[in-house]
Amino acid sequence: MKRYLMLLCLLFTSFVVSSQTTTPDSLKSALQKATSERSRLEILTNLMDISRNDDILVNAKQLYQEALKANDNYYKEAALTEILRCYINTDQTDSANTYIAKAEQELKGEARASLVSFMKMIQDTRVIFYTSGEPRKKVLMNCLFKLEEPDKLSPYEKIACNYILGMAVSNSIMEENMLKEDFKQGREYFDNVLAEAEKLPLRYAYNFLPNTYFMLCAYASNPQERGQYATRYLNTILGYSNIPEMRKRPYAVNKRQLLSAYSNLAISAEAIG
């Protein structure tokens, strides 16, 4: 197991090094020289992925405009994902809702279902964590009512409802004394997320998974269980980085999640052998 962890650490180092071999300036220079539509979209996506703070939104919006012009659904999705992250994480609700509407209009099939469900889920999760009273109650009751008739829900709706309820239980545990039944219920909600996500292509399920694994590692009742979740956590991140679309995006891997997966695996090493 120690040898395995050493190999994993080397792999993590390779991710870090790869992100340092290219700079935003070199990508901007390459963008100025690019002549084909496809090259511009690929470079803009990498520029967006490697950017920080306000530059992410600037580059994502440029990518979105060029993806619209090229009518390229994948790059529309990539751009909208980062635009929506920026607006939702800074509670710019009107702007977020505007771009959710654009996603519903521009994207097709599972790309639309996945992205729209994920972003609405994050909006509702922020309501759970940062509000109280009627807004919070409305979100919770909506999820509970939906889950009473699961056959009417899409996999994405089931995932979103279970994730939101899991986060609500987690928030209550942090605010109050931890009750054994609450602890069990929170874990069950997150396990339900995994059960539904396994039915979907990783390309579309991925957004829902890293934080779910992070929470399940925290909920684990013993080091062996934590190690099992951490192994799946890490394999999911690495598997996603290896799908065809992501092989062209070496800077898109979330290093915070990758480090979290490695850390949970490392502290469970003795238990999982």
List each model region and its residues.
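Active-site helical microenvironments for divalent-metal-assisted chemistry
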Residues: 17
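Sec-dependent N-terminal signal peptides
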Residues: 6-9
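A "functional boundary" signal
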Residues: 20-273
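Positively charged n-region of N-terminal signal peptides that target proteins for export
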Residues: 1-4
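N-terminal signal peptide c-region/cleavage motif recognized by signal peptidases
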Residues: 13-14
